[in-house]
C-alpha cells in the first residue's frame, strides 16, 4: 500500500490490479460500517454510503476500461471476485454482477486455474516450485465463484435450473481447511480434518451446500423448460441428501442446542464460526423449503405429501429464526446481514410461504402464532430500512406488485381448473410489466401493505398460490427489479 501511494505521489501510474484491490477493500469497509466506527471516524452513515458508491464505481471503472485492460493475475482476480460479491449484496443480481462474474471466469481460464490440480499441473509445481500462498488463494477464488454459481442455480429467479461451471470441466482441489497463518510459500500438508474448526470452516460449509444445489438442478426438471413438477420420489431423494448433509456437518456447525452449547468456547475464540453456522443453515433451509414448496399446499389435504408441507413450513420458520440470530453473531465480526440482498430475498420468500399456511388454515389452533411469525418477517424487513433503504424499498415494491396482482384476482372465484393458474400468472406478470413500464405504484407504508396482503390472501386457491410463489421467483427478483 505504501508503495502504491508513493508511486501516485510522484505523479506516476500505479499497478492497476493493486489499486483495484485497495479500492474494493475500502468499499467493503464502507459497506460494513457500524455506529461505533462512524463515531470513531467522526463521519455519518450518508458519508459511508457515498464512500462505498465512490470506491466501488472506481473499481468497476478499472474493470470496464477496455482501452487499458487489467492483466490477468491473482491480485486482479481477487479484486474482481470481491467486487462481484459487494455489488451483489448492495445492488442485487443486476447486469454488472453477471459481467463481473464472467470476467472472473475468463480470467481464471486465462490463468488455467480450472486445471490447477491436474496431475500435469501438480508435477510442474513439484519440479519448478511455486508460491503455495498464491495457489491457495486461487483455489479459494475458484470455489467461491463456483459455489455462487451453483447456489444461484437453485435460488429462484431467472437463473433457476442452470449453472455455468461444469464439474467435468475442472480439476481444482478444495481449499485447505486451515488458518491463514499456517499457509506459507513453501507449506505442504496443511489441510486439517473437517472436525477441526478453522477460518475456512464456514467457506467449506458453503461449498458443500452449493454442491448439493448443483445435484438438485441436475435431478429436477428446470422450471424454465418444463411445466411439470418433479416426481415426488425425486424430491424425497433430494431431501435425503439434505438430511445427510445436516448429519455430516462438524459438531461445531450443528444447530442443535447441545452442540451450540458445546461450541461456546470455540465461538468465543473464533466468533466467525457462529456466523458461519447460522448463515450456512439459513442457506440450507431456504433451499430445503424451495425443494418442497411445489407440494406443500397439496400436503395440507393429501397425506401422501404431508411431509412436504411439514418440512416447507418448518424450514421457512427456521429461516426467520436464523435471520433473527444473524444480527448478534454478525455484530461480533462486523457483518451487517440487513445490508445483504440475498439474505433479505430469502426472508421475503419465507414470509410468503408462511402466509400461504396462514391463508389456508385461518382457524387452526396455532393460526395466531403462525401469523405472528409472518409479521415478524415484516418487522425484520422494516428494521432493515434504517441501514439499507434502497434494498427494503425494492422488497416493498415487490410486495406491492404482488398486492396489485392479488387485488385483480380477488374478484375471481377460485376454480379447480388449470385456468386459475393461468389467471394468476397473467395477473402478476401484468403487474410486473406495468411496473417495469413505469406505471408507478402508490406509496404505501409497511403496516398497510402487510395488513392488506394478509386480508386478500385467503381468497386464493392452491393453484393460484403456487403460481404466485413461482412468479415471485421468476419475476419478483428479476435483475431489472432487484
Feature map (PLM): residue ranges:
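Residue position in alpha-helical solenoids
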Residues: 62-65, 107, 148, 245-248, ...
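Eukaryote-biased recognition of C-terminal alpha-helical segments
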Residues: 361, 376-429
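Classical protein tyrosine phosphatase
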Residues: 91-107
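Intrinsically disordered, low-complexity transcriptional activation domains
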Residues: 230, 339, 387, 419-482
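Amphipathic alpha-helical protein-interaction segments enriched in hydrophobic
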Residues: 73-81, 203-210, 261, 273-293, ...
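Fungal transcription factor middle regulatory core
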Residues: 2, 10, 34-39, 109, ...
Amino acid at each position: 500500500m505504501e508503495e502504491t501511494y508513493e508511486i501516485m505521489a510522484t505523479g506516476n501510474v500505479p499497478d492497476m490490479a493493486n489499486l483495484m484491490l485497495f479500492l474494493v477493500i475500502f468499499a467493503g469497509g464502507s459497506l460494513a460500517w457500524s455506529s461505533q466506527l462512524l463515531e470513531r471516524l467522526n463521519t455519518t452513515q450518508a458519508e459511508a454510503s457515498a464512500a462505498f458508491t465512490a470506491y466501488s464505481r472506481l473499481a468497476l471503472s478499472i474493470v470496464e476500461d477496455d482501452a487499458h485492460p487489467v492483466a490477468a493475475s491473482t491480485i486482479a482476480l481477487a479484486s474482481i471476485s470481491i467486487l462481484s460479491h459487494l455489488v451483489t449484496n448492495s445492488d442485487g443480481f443486476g447486469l454488472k454482477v453477471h459481467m463481473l462474474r464472467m470476467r472472473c471466469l475468463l480470467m481464471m481460464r486465462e490463468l488455467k486455474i480450472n486445471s490447477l490440480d491436474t496431475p500435469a499441473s501438480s508435477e510442474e509445481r513439484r519440479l519448478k516450485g511455486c508460491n503455495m500462498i498464491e495457489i491457495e488463494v486461487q483455489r479459494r477464488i475458484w470455489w467461491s465463484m463456483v459455489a455462487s454459481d451453483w447456489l444461484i442455480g437453485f435460488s429462484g429467479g431467472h437463473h433457476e435450473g442452470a449453472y455455468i461451471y461444469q464439474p467435468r470441466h475442472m480439476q481444482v482441489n478444495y481449499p485447505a481447511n486451515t488458518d491463514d497463518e499456517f499457509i506459507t510459500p513453501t507449506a505442504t500438508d496443511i489441510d486439517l480434518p473437517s472436525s477441526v474448526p478453522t477460518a475456512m470452516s464456514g467457506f467449506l460449509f458453503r461449498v458443500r451446500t452449493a454442491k448439493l444445489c448443483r445435484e438438485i438442478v441436475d435431478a429436477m426438471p428446470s422450471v424454465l423448460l418444463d411445466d411439470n413438477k418433479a416426481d415426488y420420489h425425486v424430491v424425497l431423494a433430494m431431501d435425503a441428501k439434505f438430511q445427510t448433509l445436516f448429519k455430516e456437518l462438524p459438531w461445531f456447525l450443528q444447530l442443535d442446542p447441545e452442540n451450540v452449547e458445546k461450541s461456546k468456547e470455540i465461538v468465543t475464540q473464533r466468533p466467525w464460526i457462529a456466523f458461519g453456522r447460522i448463515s450456512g443453515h439459513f442457506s440450507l433451509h431456504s433451499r430445503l423449503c424451495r425443494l418442497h414448496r411445489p407440494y406443500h399446499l397439496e400436503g395440507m389435504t393429501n397425506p401422501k405429501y404431508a411431509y412436504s408441507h411439514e418440512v416447507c413450513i418448518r424450514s421457512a420458520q427456521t429461516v426467520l429464526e436464523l435471520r433473527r440470530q444473524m444480527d448478534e453473531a454478525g455484530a461480533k465480526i462486523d457483518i451487517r446481514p440487513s445490508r445483504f440482498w440475498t439474505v433479505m430475498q430469502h426472508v421475503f420468500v419465507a414470509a410468503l410461504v408462511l402466509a400461504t399456511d396462514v391463508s389456508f388454515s385461518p382457524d387452526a389452533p396455532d393460526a395466531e402464532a403462525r401469523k405472528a411469525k409472518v409479521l415478524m418477517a415484516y418487522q425484520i424487513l422494516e428494521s432493515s430500512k434504517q441501514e439499507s433503504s434502497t434494498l427494503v424499498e425494492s422488497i416493498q415494491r415487490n410486495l406491492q406488485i404482488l398486492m396489485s396482482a392479488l387485488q385483480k384476482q380477488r374478484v375471481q372465484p377460485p376454480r379447480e381448473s388449470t385456468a386459475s393458474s393461468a389467471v394468476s400468472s397473467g395477473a402478476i406478470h401484468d403487474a410486473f410489466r406495468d411496473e417495469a413500464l413505469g406505471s408507478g405504484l402508490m406509496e404505501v407504508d409497511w403496516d398497510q401493505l402487510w395488513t392488506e396482503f394478509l386480508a386478500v390472501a385467503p381468497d386464493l386457491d392452491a393453484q393460484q398460490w403456487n403460481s404466485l410463489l413461482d412468479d415471485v421467483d421468476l419475476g419478483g427478483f428479476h435483475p431489472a427489479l432487484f
